[in-house]
């Protein structure tokens, strides 16, 4: 029965579409990723609108966000937004605020970094499809995606802890506000210098050439593929972690800068050479120098 081919002609249109998705792991994975990215952007956008309602106009796009309608949302999302947008660390329910900040940063990672992992995931799907055509076992691509996202979930813990540290030591008015003076300049300086480093280039090369890595580490064991996803996530983190520091200089809930960083990482991983990295690094260093001069 499993070897028979079915055209699902007795199902309605929706049923045939669902059967087609279920039969094609590649399509199912791409749909899952697409929905996840859209959902992450929706939640971040809704949170940014809520944050703009109670903040003075200052950051780019604040006026636009203030004029956008605030959508009615379920109560659990309102509570999640309130924990993330609290002006300072909460003394009472602080135990819930820390996981909320981790989830906020993880949503940023899904929104900005998962699209740039599309070549990796697409390449794995192609290899898996070829293996199945030959009758060989292949681990579902979502196992690879889960490993990749697990790396960014771990990184989100670090970024959320850094959020609390920056608020405590950088003198920001509110917890997610831009880091001012030396703290903001330091974030830009580190991000800018890293764009010229050999480690950045080594990680970028791994992200740009997923086929050789996947082919050399191919396995039919889910644990091995999950670990492969973790490793590829580490390479991506090594490539992009410094860019995430820019969010501390512009404000963690600045969705316009989120989109710009996501677009840059997508372009950087699809191109060759170091031009994009060096241009970005130069801009960040000039920006850091300007911020230092202004705050002096």
Where are these regions (language model features)?
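Histidine-/acidic- and/or cysteine-rich, low-complexity loops and terminal segments associated
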Residues: 2-106, 130-133, 171-176, 201-216, ...
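Selective transmembrane alpha-helices of multi-pass membrane proteins
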Residues: 26-38, 172-197, 276-296
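Residue-level signature of transmembrane alpha-helical entry/exit and packing/kink sites
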Residues: 29, 33, 97-101, 140, ...
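Membrane-interface elements of multi-pass transporters and channels
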Residues: 50, 118-121, 165-173, 201-204, ...
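Functional transmembrane helices that embed catalytic/metal-coordinating motifs
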Residues: 99-126, 146-155, 193-218, 222-269
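Acidic, low-complexity central loop/insert segments
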Residues: 134-165
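Interfacial helix-loop-helix junctions of multi-pass membrane proteins
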Residues: 164, 241-251, 278, 285-294
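Hydrophobic alpha-helical transmembrane segments and immediately flanking/interface helices
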Residues: 166-187, 245-273
């Amino acid at each position: 029965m499993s070897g028979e081919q079915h055209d699902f002609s007795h199902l309605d249109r929706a049923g045939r579409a669902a059967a087609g998705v279920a039969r094609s792991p590649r399509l199912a994975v791409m749909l899952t990723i697409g929905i996840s990215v859209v959902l992450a952007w929706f939640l971040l956008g809704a949170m940014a609108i809520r944050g703009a309602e109670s903040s003075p106009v200052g950051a780019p796009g604040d006026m636009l966000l203030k004029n956008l309608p605030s959508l009615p949302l379920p109560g659990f999302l309102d509570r999640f937004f309130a924990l993330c947008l609290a002006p300072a660390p909460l003394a009472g329910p602080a135990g819930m605020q820390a996981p909320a900040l981790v989830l906020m940063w993880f949503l940023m990672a899904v929104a900005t970094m998962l699209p740039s992992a599309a070549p990796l995931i697409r390449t794995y799907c192609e290899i898996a499809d070829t293996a199945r055509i030959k009758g060989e076992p292949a681990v579902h691509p979502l196992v690879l995606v889960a490993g990749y996202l697990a790396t960014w979930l771990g990184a989100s813990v670090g970024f959320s802890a850094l959020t609390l540290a920056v608020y405590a030591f950088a003198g920001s008015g509110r917890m997610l506000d831009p880091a001012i003076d030396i703290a903001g300049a330091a974030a830009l300086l580190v991000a800018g210098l890293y764009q010229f480093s050999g480690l950045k280039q080594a990680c970028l090369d791994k992200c740009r050439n997923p086929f050789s890595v996947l082919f050399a580490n191919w396995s039919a064991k889910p644990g091995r593929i999950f670990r492969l996803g973790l490793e590829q996530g580490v390479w991506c983190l090594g490539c992009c972690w410094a860019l995430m520091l820019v969010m501390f200089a512009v404000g963690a809930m600045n969705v316009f800068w989120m989109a710009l960083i996501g677009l840059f990482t997508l372009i950087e991983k699809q191109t060759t050479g170091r031009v994009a990295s060096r241009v970005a690094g130069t801009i960040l260093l000039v920006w850091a120098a300007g911020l230092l001069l202004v705050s002096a």
